[in-house]
């Protein structure tokens, strides 16, 4: 089946993938755009797996201050080169991750950062291990802008687009007065 330039352009706009990748995916899918998107997503995941071992030492620290200035977040997102770190796609990813941190209050970047002695309390609070991971691990949280994807999916999609490893290294979340004891007049009996 002959794939038109319009089909390739449309798929590219939807996925951000390269021209030849879009053309190959459309050819493999017999012109079916939805199947081509699935193929590109799978390729993106395999690219992410291949690149995960590469050092990501460049990148940026992205701030996000929620309207009203009462909640804010800082995230460090790393990539392999300063070229990628300056792209609008990378900056958008970092901004979205910072917004996620401000909105969802994760405690850890990923499951491997959870201390062993914290598991009992987390399982008691959330009911089971999987729910606890989704609640407290940034990469496993459902993306606030798209409830069908996690932050890990968002990062992996960007790895596939830019062709470099991307790592969410760390974050800090600030909420005005969150760590202060209640004032004497706020204490109820």
Question: What does each model-identified segment do?
Answer:
Residues 2-189:
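N-terminal assembly/interaction segments in proteins that build large macromolecular machines
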